């Protein structure tokens, strides 16, 4: 073995040892989440977010993720109201683990509903926390925001933003007539069914918080698939229609039962943006939802 070879090998060993020492000495914090406990870097620099509300939370805290899962090219810009630089890492339904790994993240944030099944695979790539967003309540989404802030070391920014959020919701609540007893339903008309967002859904619980009651109560899940007959039974006074599949809507409108619904009889069926009302689930989205709901309700 030549002196040059020995020198090269020694250099590589020193570099490896140095890297391991640096990794070992890096400060971490333990985060409790839906899939257990994870040690994350004290100041994560390369975060991958696999759900829109997590992207929103990071943006509120002044952090731009290096990788984001999205279905459409305009989803993130629509969510944030601005363009940011990031790498697409597949869709929320099917994240691309290879792309995520190539980014060498130091924190991955996944959704309990969508990603608990691949938690171990994500954890092999980088420290991963699993939080509630999809099919979760408003308060559960707030808790997820708090956990993200803790994970990235931005609790002061979190406290300030939540205080502003509460202030805005309290201001909105004052605009709601306490004598208005109309009950609302948020519904997504798909090709073959309607998904109703009940009182424990993100938007349902949010609206209840400012004094707008939900017609869909005592459901097993925050969102439920219902028939026209069930809709007649719940009989909402107001329907916020977050996306209307033309085929199903036409079919229902041709059914005499449709005209028995109070909201239909009174002309209180309003089309609202599905992304805003049912997909984003962030603080800014929540504030926009309550403002729009109040505006629509005050038209009558």
What spans do the regions from the language model cover?
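Proline-aspartate-enriched helix->loop->beta-strand connector
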Residues: 104-109, 127, 231, 235-239
């Amino acid at each position: 073995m030549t002196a040059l070879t020995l020198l090269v090998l020694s250099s590589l060993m020193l570099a490896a040892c140095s890297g391991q020492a640096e990794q070992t000495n890096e400060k971490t914090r333990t985060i409790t989440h839906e899939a257990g406990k994870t040690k994350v870097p004290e100041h994560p620099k390369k975060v991958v977010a696999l759900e829109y509300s997590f992207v929103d939370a990071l943006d509120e805290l002044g952090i731009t993720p290096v990788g984001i899962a999205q279905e459409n090219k305009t989803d993130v810009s629509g969510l944030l109201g601005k363009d940011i630089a990031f790498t697409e890492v597949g869709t929320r339904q099917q994240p691309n683990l290879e792309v995520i790994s190539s980014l060498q993240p130091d924190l991955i944030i996944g959704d309990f509903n969508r990603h608990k099944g691949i938690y171990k695979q994500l954890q092999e790539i980088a420290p991963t926390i699993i939080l509630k967003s999809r099919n979760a309540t408003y308060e559960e989404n707030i808790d997820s925001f708090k956990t993200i802030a803790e994970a990235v070391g931005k609790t002061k920014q979190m406290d300030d933003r939540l205080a502003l959020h509460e202030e805005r919701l309290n201001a909105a609540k004052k605009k709601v007539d306490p004598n208005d007893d109309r009950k609302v339903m948020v519904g997504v008309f798909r090709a073959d069914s309607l998904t109703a967002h009940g009182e424990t859904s993100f938007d349902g619980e949010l609206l209840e918080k400012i004094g707008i009651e939900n017609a869909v109560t005592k459901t097993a899940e925050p969102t439920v698939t219902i028939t026209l007959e069930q809709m007649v039974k719940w009989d909402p006074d107001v329907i916020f229609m977050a996306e209307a599949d033309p085929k199903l809507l036409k079919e229902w409108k041709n059914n005499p039962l449709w005209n028995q619904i109070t909201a239909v009889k009174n002309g209180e069926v309003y089309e609202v943006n599905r992304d805003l009302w049912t997909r984003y689930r962030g603080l800014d989205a929540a504030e926009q939802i309550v403002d729009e709901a109040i505006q629509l309700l005050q038209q009558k």
